[in-house]
Amino acid sequence: MGDIIEGTKPTLDDLWAGDEDQKPQTPPVSPPRSPSFKHEHKSPFPGSTSPPPASPIGEEDLKPRTARASSSTSKVKSRKASPEEFKPVLIDDLPTAWDEAHETFEALEKCVYERKDIGLSKENDEMMVCECVYNRHDPDADPCGPDSDCINRALYIECIAGECRAGKHCHNQQFSKRQYANVDVVLTEKKGYGLRASSTIPANTLIYEYIGEVVAEKTFRKRMQQYADEGIRHFYFMMLQKEEYIDATKKGGIGRFANHSCNPNCEVQKWVVGRRLRMGIFTKRDVIKGEEITFNYNVDRYGHDAQTCYCGEPNCVGTIGGKTQTDIGTMNDLFLDALGITDEVEAMGMKGSKKKKSRQLDEDFVPILRPISAHEVQKVAAAIRQSMENKKMMSRLLQRIQMTDDGAMHRQLMRMHGFSLMYMVLTELADDNEIVLLALESMNKWKLQIRNKIEDSKIEEPVKALSQSGDEKICGLAKQLIEYWSTLELSYKIPRVSKIASLDADDEAGTQTIAEANVVSAARRPDAWENTQEIQIDIAPVRPRTLPVSRPRPPPPPPPLPVKKPALNSMSSTDRLKLDAIIAMAEQTVQAQAAAAAVEATASPQAGSSRSGSRPAEDEERRKRQKRTHMTEEELAEQKERRLRKLIGAVVVKSMNKYKDMMEHDTFKKYARECTDTLVKKEKKRNPSYQDVKHPSLSDDKKAKIKSFTKDYTHKILKHLKEKGKLRNPKSSSSLRTNSNDPRQAASSSTNGDTPSISTTPSQGATQRLRDGELVDDIFGADEDMVMDLDEDTPEMQNDHPAPPSVPPATPPLPPVHVEVVDNVSTPTSQWET
């Protein structure tokens, strides 16, 4: 599969090792070391141990051997030793080390790529669809599950959400949904950090995805040298496919902590998820709680010495690394089953041990190949998809297909996307004439009734190219196939809405490059998750808005006291005091009225301005109502259709807005109108009664259908633009994007940059809705008639008269007046209590 190139971590080309029938036999684990050794995890191991010299090989083992036997059971099966019964040794006494382990690397949620054009799968769209259907009458149904007959699962292809006919009951979306097993990170004594099962894990379960930075060959070589210069001995490289590697040395997931074992309970598998190839660690058998998660590294050393193995298994070979893709000892069970040699390998002990070197395929072990039997078809098809970088393995698998003459097996191979697999072989390995010839000879035996599979798999393209080959035999077979396929008729099938068309756009939007990830991680560094700095913002006090209160003017200062005159008679003096009091009260009343008049005079210009400003608005409303009254039936129908168009257009624009940056603005408006017009025609045809509704609206169900149609429509547009080279590259991160053409945003940024203040702008969601509304008006035009009709429903607009002006609040009462009567004083003194 792939190769982990690391002192103790695997490359991916041949990460297939171990026997599914064997059970682990781990010796007791020593007590964990002290936490002071935490920086010594995966400590350097001693140098490589030279394997013992190979035993002499008989001449008969070097001769190619084939057999026409129908049974795949080896004659040596009777000599196969029965496996010992033993119980796996648990490591549940080891301490967990989540925090310490996470200090050694930077966690990633998913793989990031050096470029977006690497890490892509070579599968055709025809291979992405399975045949599983959910049966609601079967309570034990497990569509696309480990025990089902799902083609996708057999070929290590994940079903597409929304495309699989099992719907929400599909059990083959583990990578997309991140359905990882329950494991703990622990600190071992000799192997550094490791993974431990926190509960019982069934077979064929995804433990964790192998996550890291996907780099090209040149960068991989450069990093190997860089890490060596930095003194890093244990690299975490895994080969994804030819000239592409996953580097989890400094950035990745906890899958990097799974340790090596010569008798592992897990294996690494290469899966197709959408448009990408992804690696996952899967259980080979049931793993009990407390057992360590291990798999066979099969290290290609790339100039580094092999490491000492500490797995402690009875079949331990003593070292990690130095293995090749054809080494029987580390070959995955999938390839052994596909070649039909599992029993023979087990019986003869070809996997090797510390005392015995393992055999090499086609060097010191040439297997007897037999025609494919029914139970081997899925294994052979899956092994072909996994062997694109292993020409020796591919040649052996194609030999088995070529020697199979059973028509039932041919039909099963075609059902397992045989033509699409041959398309991959002829495009990826076109330089190997032996492999090309075997593929053409195999397909020449496959009989068809219709040519639909030929069209879906696109196999005719590479075969036509081979018809011009200089090799006469290859050229003749290619022409023979093309002539045969041309006689077949194409069967018509009812097309259905496919989610596969959206894979390219979804991959473009969901894939992140290393450069983009570095920008985001700089903005969201680990110490930025918590606010540790206090920000002081000075806010000016805000007075409550109240109406002005009339305050009486202070009284004039009292005049100087006159010269006291002799008192008059008592009767005239009392009358004079009463008269003075009456005069003083009258003057106070006059002053209060004058103050109230001044306040009213101050407020009157504002009221007049408000009344004068509302008059044009009232005239405009009256004009709209008159226009509404004199509209013809054709104009009314046109108006309602315009409303429906804008109502649907708002949902369309909102759905397409996600991909707005991937095309020109005018192009976006053009396709938004076309999509809306299509939906309006459908709605008018399905629901002619929309004209009877005064204020039409869309239900949630109808909005969901519009969004789904718009998404598929947009993806087709993006694919069309991409083919014409008019597709724009979206910005790396919307959060880091600045729109210099938006005056509102520029003004906001310039204002906020001066001094800290309380934000008065609307929320992000409100701003986005405002922009969507402006974009809808820009595309479909503003609808004044809709606003007019909505206003007609308000109580204020039920008659032709405007609403009465608001009455200002009454002037607050004057404060009480206390009058002090002074004898022989012509003018009294008044005091205002506040």
From Swiss-Prot:
It comes from the Eukaryota. Residues 720-729 have a biased composition (Basic residues). Keywords: Chromosome, Methyltransferase, Nucleus, Repressor, S-adenosyl-L-methionine, Transcription, Transcription regulation, Transferase. Residues 541-550 have a biased composition (Low complexity). It is an enzyme of class 2 (transferase). One of its GO terms (cellular component) is chromosome. InterPro entries: AWS_dom, Post-SET_dom, Set2_fungi, SET2_Histone-Lys_MeTrsfase, SET_dom, SET_dom_sf, SETD2/Set2_SET, SRI. One of its GO terms (molecular function) is histone H3K36 trimethyltransferase activity. Residues 181-298 form the SET domain. Residues 1-83, 531-568, 601-638, 680-703, 720-818 are annotated as: Disordered. Residues 305-321 form the Post-SET domain. Residues 125-179 form the AWS domain. GO terms for biological process: methylation; regulation of DNA-templated transcription. Residues 25-34, 551-563, 802-816 have a biased composition (Pro residues). Residues 775-795 have a biased composition (Acidic residues). It catalyses: L-lysyl(36)-[histone H3] + 3 S-adenosyl-L-methionine = N(6),N(6),N(6)-trimethyl-L-lysyl(36)-[histone H3] + 3 S-adenosyl-L-homocysteine + 3 H(+). Belongs to the class V-like SAM-binding methyltransferase superfamily. Histone-lysine methyltransferase family. SET2 subfamily. PANTHER family: SET DOMAIN PROTEINS. This is Histone-lysine N-methyltransferase, H3 lysine-36 specific. The gene is SET2.
